[in-house]
Protein backbone atom coordinates (compact mmCIF):
# COMPACT_ATOMS: atom_id res chain seq x y z
CA UNK A 1 0.00 0.00 0.00
CA UNK A 2 1.26 3.47 -0.89
CA UNK A 3 0.76 5.03 2.54
CA UNK A 4 1.73 8.53 1.46
CA UNK A 5 -0.89 8.51 -1.30
CA UNK A 6 -3.54 7.05 1.01
CA UNK A 7 -2.92 9.70 3.66
CA UNK A 8 -3.07 12.48 1.07
CA UNK A 9 -6.30 11.05 -0.37
CA UNK A 10 -8.00 10.71 3.02
CA UNK A 11 -6.99 14.18 4.17
CA UNK A 12 -8.31 15.70 0.93
CA UNK A 13 -11.49 13.61 1.12
CA UNK A 14 -12.13 14.72 4.69
CA UNK A 15 -11.68 18.39 3.87
CA UNK A 16 -14.05 18.09 0.92
CA UNK A 17 -16.75 16.29 2.90
CA UNK A 18 -16.62 18.78 5.76
CA UNK A 19 -16.79 21.69 3.32
CA UNK A 20 -19.72 20.10 1.47
CA UNK A 21 -21.59 19.85 4.76
CA UNK A 22 -20.97 23.52 5.53
CA UNK A 23 -19.07 22.56 8.68
CA UNK A 24 -15.86 24.03 10.09
CA UNK A 25 -13.97 21.00 11.36
CA UNK A 26 -14.32 17.66 13.14
CA UNK A 27 -14.73 16.19 16.60
CA UNK A 28 -13.38 12.70 17.22
CA UNK A 29 -13.56 10.37 20.18
CA UNK A 30 -10.25 8.73 21.03
CA UNK A 31 -10.15 5.44 22.89
CA UNK A 32 -6.48 4.61 23.28
CA UNK A 33 -6.63 2.14 20.39
CA UNK A 34 -4.94 2.18 17.01
CA UNK A 35 -8.03 2.95 14.92
CA UNK A 36 -8.93 6.13 16.76
CA UNK A 37 -5.23 7.08 16.87
CA UNK A 38 -4.88 6.89 13.08
CA UNK A 39 -8.19 8.68 12.53
CA UNK A 40 -7.22 11.46 14.95
CA UNK A 41 -3.86 12.08 13.27
CA UNK A 42 -5.53 12.20 9.85
CA UNK A 43 -8.12 14.62 11.20
CA UNK A 44 -5.43 16.87 12.61
CA UNK A 45 -3.62 16.87 9.26
CA UNK A 46 -6.84 17.91 7.54
CA UNK A 47 -7.83 20.52 10.13
CA UNK A 48 -4.83 21.70 12.17
CA UNK A 49 -6.88 24.49 13.74
CA UNK A 50 -10.33 22.87 13.78
CA UNK A 51 -9.88 19.36 15.13
CA UNK A 52 -11.02 18.49 18.64
CA UNK A 53 -10.39 15.11 20.26
CA UNK A 54 -12.56 14.00 23.15
CA UNK A 55 -11.37 11.51 25.73
CA UNK A 56 -14.53 10.00 27.20
CA UNK A 57 -13.71 7.65 30.09
CA UNK A 58 -16.50 5.30 31.10
CA UNK A 59 -15.13 2.51 33.26
CA UNK A 60 -12.04 2.86 31.07
CA UNK A 61 -8.70 1.27 31.85
CA UNK A 62 -5.80 3.34 33.12
CA UNK A 63 -3.73 1.96 30.24
CA UNK A 64 -6.13 3.39 27.64
CA UNK A 65 -6.06 6.81 29.29
CA UNK A 66 -2.26 6.79 29.35
CA UNK A 67 -2.13 5.82 25.68
CA UNK A 68 -4.57 8.59 24.78
CA UNK A 69 -2.41 11.17 26.49
CA UNK A 70 0.71 9.77 24.80
CA UNK A 71 -0.87 10.11 21.35
CA UNK A 72 -2.46 13.52 21.83
CA UNK A 73 0.65 15.07 23.32
CA UNK A 74 2.92 13.63 20.63
CA UNK A 75 0.85 15.07 17.78
CA UNK A 76 -0.27 18.24 19.60
CA UNK A 77 -3.94 17.45 19.05
CA UNK A 78 -6.28 19.66 21.11
CA UNK A 79 -8.44 17.58 23.44
CA UNK A 80 -10.85 17.61 26.33
CA UNK A 81 -11.50 14.92 28.92
CA UNK A 82 -15.17 14.41 29.80
CA UNK A 83 -15.80 11.82 32.51
CA UNK A 84 -18.90 9.75 31.82
CA UNK A 85 -18.72 7.33 34.76
CA UNK A 86 -21.23 9.18 36.95
CA UNK A 87 -23.77 9.61 34.15
CA UNK A 88 -23.34 5.97 33.18
CA UNK A 89 -23.86 4.72 36.74
CA UNK A 90 -26.92 6.92 37.18
CA UNK A 91 -28.49 5.57 34.00
CA UNK A 92 -27.68 1.98 34.93
CA UNK A 93 -29.29 2.47 38.35
CA UNK A 94 -32.43 4.00 36.86
CA UNK A 95 -32.79 1.47 34.05
CA UNK A 96 -32.12 -1.59 36.16
CA UNK A 97 -34.57 -0.46 38.81
CA UNK A 98 -37.38 -1.71 36.57
CA UNK A 99 -35.59 -4.05 34.13
CA UNK A 100 -34.11 -7.04 35.90
CA UNK A 101 -31.49 -8.89 33.86
CA UNK A 102 -28.67 -11.21 34.77
CA UNK A 103 -25.57 -12.69 33.20
CA UNK A 104 -24.31 -12.08 29.69
CA UNK A 105 -27.37 -10.14 28.51
CA UNK A 106 -26.98 -7.57 31.28
CA UNK A 107 -23.26 -7.30 30.56
CA UNK A 108 -23.92 -6.64 26.87
CA UNK A 109 -26.63 -4.06 27.55
CA UNK A 110 -24.35 -2.23 29.96
CA UNK A 111 -21.47 -2.42 27.50
CA UNK A 112 -23.48 -0.98 24.60
CA UNK A 113 -24.66 1.92 26.72
CA UNK A 114 -21.09 3.25 26.89
CA UNK A 115 -20.59 4.01 23.16
CA UNK A 116 -24.11 5.44 23.02
CA UNK A 117 -23.27 7.89 25.79
CA UNK A 118 -20.09 8.79 23.93
CA UNK A 119 -22.05 9.35 20.73
CA UNK A 120 -24.36 11.80 22.51
CA UNK A 121 -21.40 13.66 23.98
CA UNK A 122 -19.59 13.84 20.64
CA UNK A 123 -22.63 15.28 18.87
CA UNK A 124 -23.19 17.87 21.59
CA UNK A 125 -19.60 19.03 21.21
CA UNK A 126 -19.72 18.94 17.41
CA UNK A 127 -22.98 20.87 17.15
CA UNK A 128 -21.70 23.52 19.55
CA UNK A 129 -18.66 24.11 17.33
CA UNK A 130 -20.22 23.68 13.90
CA UNK A 131 -18.14 20.53 13.38
CA UNK A 132 -18.89 17.01 12.13
CA UNK A 133 -18.40 13.83 14.15
CA UNK A 134 -15.63 11.68 12.70
CA UNK A 135 -15.84 7.92 13.19
CA UNK A 136 -13.05 5.42 13.75
CA UNK A 137 -14.55 2.14 12.51
CA UNK A 138 -12.50 0.24 9.92
CA UNK A 139 -13.66 -1.79 6.91
CA UNK A 140 -13.13 -5.11 8.69
CA UNK A 141 -15.51 -4.10 11.49
CA UNK A 142 -18.04 -2.56 9.11
CA UNK A 143 -18.12 -5.71 6.95
CA UNK A 144 -19.29 -7.91 9.83
CA UNK A 145 -21.25 -5.24 11.71
CA UNK A 146 -18.88 -5.19 14.66
CA UNK A 147 -20.05 -1.94 16.21
CA UNK A 148 -22.79 -0.61 18.46
CA UNK A 149 -25.88 0.71 16.67
CA UNK A 150 -26.27 4.42 17.44
CA UNK A 151 -22.97 4.20 19.33
CA UNK A 152 -19.59 4.08 17.60
CA UNK A 153 -21.47 3.65 14.31
CA UNK A 154 -23.39 6.88 14.95
CA UNK A 155 -21.11 9.35 13.17
CA UNK A 156 -21.12 11.71 10.19
CA UNK A 157 -18.05 10.33 8.40
CA UNK A 158 -16.03 7.10 8.60
CA UNK A 159 -12.51 8.01 7.51
CA UNK A 160 -11.26 4.42 7.92
CA UNK A 161 -14.27 2.83 6.25
CA UNK A 162 -12.33 1.59 3.20
CA UNK A 163 -9.31 0.32 5.16
CA UNK A 164 -8.91 -3.21 6.46
CA UNK A 165 -7.50 -3.62 9.96
CA UNK A 166 -4.12 -4.64 8.53
CA UNK A 167 -4.10 -1.48 6.40
CA UNK A 168 -4.90 0.67 9.43
CA UNK A 169 -1.91 -0.90 11.18
CA UNK A 170 0.26 -0.18 8.15
CA UNK A 171 -0.83 3.46 8.20
CA UNK A 172 -0.21 3.62 11.94
CA UNK A 173 3.41 2.63 11.42
CA UNK A 174 3.78 5.12 8.58
CA UNK A 175 2.33 7.92 10.73
CA UNK A 176 4.60 6.98 13.66
CA UNK A 177 1.78 6.23 16.05
CA UNK A 178 3.38 5.15 19.37
CA UNK A 179 4.29 1.47 19.14
CA UNK A 180 2.61 0.68 22.44
CA UNK A 181 -0.70 1.62 20.79
CA UNK A 182 0.01 -0.27 17.56
CA UNK A 183 1.00 -3.46 19.39
CA UNK A 184 -1.77 -3.60 21.99
CA UNK A 185 -4.53 -6.20 21.76
CA UNK A 186 -7.56 -4.71 19.95
CA UNK A 187 -10.39 -4.06 22.39
CA UNK A 188 -13.49 -1.92 22.50
CA UNK A 189 -13.02 -1.52 26.24
CA UNK A 190 -16.59 -2.68 26.77
CA UNK A 191 -15.72 -4.64 29.91
CA UNK A 192 -12.60 -5.73 31.75
CA UNK A 193 -10.58 -8.18 29.67
CA UNK A 194 -12.78 -7.83 26.58
CA UNK A 195 -11.03 -8.21 23.22
CA UNK A 196 -12.35 -7.79 19.68
CA UNK A 197 -11.05 -11.10 18.39
CA UNK A 198 -12.38 -13.13 21.31
CA UNK A 199 -15.80 -11.55 20.94
CA UNK A 200 -15.88 -12.11 17.17
CA UNK A 201 -14.47 -15.61 17.48
CA UNK A 202 -11.91 -15.02 14.71
CA UNK A 203 -8.73 -13.03 14.28
CA UNK A 204 -8.48 -9.83 12.26
CA UNK A 205 -5.98 -11.63 10.04
CA UNK A 206 -8.56 -14.30 9.22
CA UNK A 207 -11.25 -11.69 8.66
CA UNK A 208 -9.05 -9.55 6.42
CA UNK A 209 -8.00 -12.57 4.35
CA UNK A 210 -11.65 -13.41 3.79
CA UNK A 211 -12.59 -9.86 2.81
CA UNK A 212 -9.58 -9.24 0.58
CA UNK A 213 -9.08 -12.67 -0.99
CA UNK A 214 -12.39 -14.45 -0.35
CA UNK A 215 -10.57 -17.31 1.35
CA UNK A 216 -10.49 -19.01 4.71
CA UNK A 217 -11.03 -22.24 6.57
CA UNK A 218 -14.64 -23.52 6.46
CA UNK A 219 -15.09 -22.86 10.17
CA UNK A 220 -13.84 -19.30 9.78
CA UNK A 221 -16.13 -18.60 6.83
CA UNK A 222 -19.09 -19.99 8.75
CA UNK A 223 -18.25 -17.84 11.74
CA UNK A 224 -18.00 -14.71 9.58
CA UNK A 225 -21.35 -15.50 7.96
CA UNK A 226 -22.95 -15.72 11.41
CA UNK A 227 -21.56 -12.46 12.77
List PLM regions with ranges.
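ATP-dependent adenylation/nucleotidyltransferase module used to activate substrates
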Residues: 1-144
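Catalytic subdomain that performs nucleotidyl-dependent activation
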Residues: 73, 110-114, 118, 132-205
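Generic alpha-helical structural context detector
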Residues: 89, 93, 148, 170-173, ...
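Short alpha-helical "packing" element that flanks the helix-turn-helix/winged-helix DNA-binding module
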Residues: 206-215
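Intrinsic disorder and flexible/low-complexity segments
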Residues: 216-227
